[in-house]
Regions:
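Beta1/beta-strand and adjacent pyrophosphate-binding region of the FAD-binding site
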Residues: 8-20
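N-terminal Rossmann-fold NAD(P) dinucleotide-binding loop
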Residues: 23
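Predominantly extracellular/luminal regions of secreted and cell-surface proteins
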Residues: 439-462
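Conserved hydrophobic helix-helix packing surfaces used for dimerization/oligomerization
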Residues: 14-16, 37, 366
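Short, mixed charged/polar active-site loops
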Residues: 7-9, 138-142, 535
Length: 581
């Protein structure tokens, strides 16, 4: 019997399944390169675990701001700075709108919201189409594309396409890891539901629902009395699912997580002196945020040993730096077992992540991103955090653009065009440990400027690194001039500014740095070009909110001049790069 529901087919160059931060970043990078991209997402808002539906803070190599100058840049920095600009009250709905707007305003990108991927059609080892069910329209939507990517978290395309994948913890001996169990198993890190609170002027009573659990003593909780350090955004250790099937058992686990969550809040309010008399529940997470389920197998599987060695790969295209934060599969139950709920195994920051982890080893046109990339369980305990996922996804999005432009496979990008991909990412303000930006446009240019030395603009590093600033330091009124002996024909000029990389700008309750633009960021500046001895203005900016600002350049010129006019409060700032393309 034919379905009574309507069907629609869409053609695209690239189809990304899953619209969390990874899927968004990958889709945007490829779409901005001029290719037609469709993003299929099963929720009404983008952002995944980082959205207002789940509110997981975006962690990464800077370890919640504890390690300066390691914050992820590129598209993620663009999104976070825009949130700083328009969200002075720290609203998660406004953050959702920042993410929505980034997708909505990209002309080459079509987003299918509330559309859950449920089928795929193969032609040998290539995906031809994927099909999703859109709940709001009761429509079956099929997307035909040249390339596909799975950023769904649960790796939904793996069982639909026959792509190789893994589930669970590897045995220690398989890759020489020390974190895993002696014998491989299917246990994973679990999923969590959190809450957020609001401080009120008057005492706020709380009556526990009859169906919620009761916890009379701190010893019944995974972190004991120490687990209540932050009453405003707790708690990640309300976690289950690692001992079950973290996909199939989700709906059975969700009510249990809510019983635990409200039981913990009852304990805080009514069963001990936790300083919560004036706190009220503001928000409860009803959609659990997952850490681990399926993981694809690529041409390389990143391991604990790789991370500990610093990830020194010739095909480094992304980086991480979170500790190997391995969660006990028992989750909340670990307290009853007398076991730690998690262990932070040491990891260097930053460490490189190779391109070979970002595509399927047995399908010819499938990229992977987010927490389902090609890593072991031990390595995933570090790479799973959202900031790290964004760096891998932007790399895959750039690789997709190269593959489409050249008509090649994801694997061939790494085999034949790796340097092109690395330089593309560096020019998009991504950071690759050990890889320097090549600047042929400045090779024969003369650079001069007031303020500190401007020669740092030639060194190919676009952030503070190893104690070196790698920037032209300047104060309002200072000027930088770049001159060539002959007229140059460039299409655009990109400026990469200092953006307070020592700060933590992720949206987190109680974090003042996420409520305003960094004082170090250039607010106002003028960019001019010289032709036939006359200066003309390319851009006069009065309210910049970008670390990477791009300006078109049409007519030929033989000099550029940048004048810093104002910062967002700092006495001085810096310019890391001036790129002419």
């Amino acid at each position: 019997m034919d379905s009574p529901f309507p069907k629609e087919t869409i053609s695209a160059d690239f189809c990304v399944v899953g619209g969390g931060i990874a899927g968004m970043t990958m889709a945007l990078e490829c779409a901005r390169a001029g290719f037609r991209v469709v993003l299929m997402h099963d929720r009404p808002v983008p952002g995944g675990n980082a959205s207002g539906e789940c509110r997981v803070q975006i962690s990464g190599a800077d370890r919640l701001g504890k390690l300066p100058n390691l914050r992820e840049t590129g598209i993620l920095e663009e999104l976070r700075l825009e949130n700083c600009r328009i969200n002075p009250n720290g609203s998660y709905s406004v953050w959702d709108m920042v993410l929505w707007s980034a997708l909505e305003t990209e002309p080459n990108l079509q987003v299918l919201y509330n559309c859950s991927c449920r089928a795929a059609v193969m032609a040998g080892n290539r995906i031809k189409t994927v099909t999703g069910w859109q709940t709001t329209t009761q429509k079956e939507i099929t997307v035909a594309a040249k390339l596909f990517a799975d950023c769904s978290g649960d790796a939904v395309l793996a069982p639909l396409t026959g792509a190789d994948f893994r589930v669970g913890r590897e045995a220690r001996g398989e890759f020489g890891e020390t974190i895993g169990p002696e014998t491989a198993d299917r246990r994973t890190m679990g999923m969590s539901c959190i809450f957020q609170t609001r401080r009120c002027d008057t005492p706020q009573p709380f009556e526990k629902p009859a169906w919620a659990h009761t916890y009379c003593d701190d010893s019944e909780l995974p972190c004991g009395a120490d687990g209540h350090a932050n009453l405003h955004e707790g708690y990640w250790w309300v976690e289950l699912g690692g001992e079950c099937d973290s996909i199939a058992d989700t709906e059975a686990l969700r009510p249990e997580l809510l019983k635990i969550l409200l039981g913990v809040w009852d304990h805080i309010k009514n069963r001990g002196d936790h300083g919560a008399e004036h706190l009220a529940l503001e928000w409860i997470q009803f959609l659990p945020s997952k850490r681990e389920s399926r993981r694809y197998v690529g041409d390389h599987i990143l391991t604990q040993r790789d991370i500990e060695a610093g990830g020194r790969f010739p095909d480094t295209v992304a980086y991480g730096g979170w500790t190997m934060d391995d969660h006990n599969p028992a989750g909340f139950r670990s307290a009853a077992l007398g076991e730690p709920v998690n262990i932070h195994h040491p990891a260097p920051s930053p460490y490189g992540i190779p391109y070979r982890c970002l595509y399927s080893r047995n399908l010819d046109n499938l990229f992977v991103g987010g927490r389902c990339v090609s890593v072991t369980h031990a390595a995933l305990s570090s790479t799973r955090v959202i900031g790290t996922c964004s760096t891998m996804a932007q790399a895959a999005g750039g690789a997709a653009a190269i593959a489409l432009r050249r008509g090649i496979s994801p694997r061939e990008v790494g085999q034949r065009h790796l340097a092109e991909l690395q330089q593309l990412l560096l020019r998009r303000d991504c950071y690759l440990p050990g890889v320097r930006l090549e600047l042929p446009e400045l090779a024969h240019a003369r650079i001069s400027g007031t303020g500190s030395t401007s020669e740092a603009l030639r060194d190919g590093v676009t952030r503070v690194e190893g104690g070196a600033l790698h920037q032209w330091r300047c104060r309002p009124g200072d000027q930088l001039t770049v001159e060539w002996d002959a007229p140059q024909h460039f299409r655009r000029i990109s400026l990469i500014f200092e953006s307070g990389m020592q700060r933590r700008i992720a949206l987190v309750p109680g974090n003042p740095d996420c409520l305003r633009l960094p004082p170090e960021l250039a607010k106002a500046y003028r960019l001019e070009a010289r032709s036939e001895g006359r200066w003309r203005t390319l851009a006069e900016v009065s309210a910049n909110a970008r670390r990477r600002a791009v300006h078109p350049a049409e007519a030929p010129f033989d000099a550029l001049r940048l004048t810093l006019l104002e910062t967002y409060g700092a006495a001085e700032t810096g310019l890391h790069a001036l790129l002419a393309e």
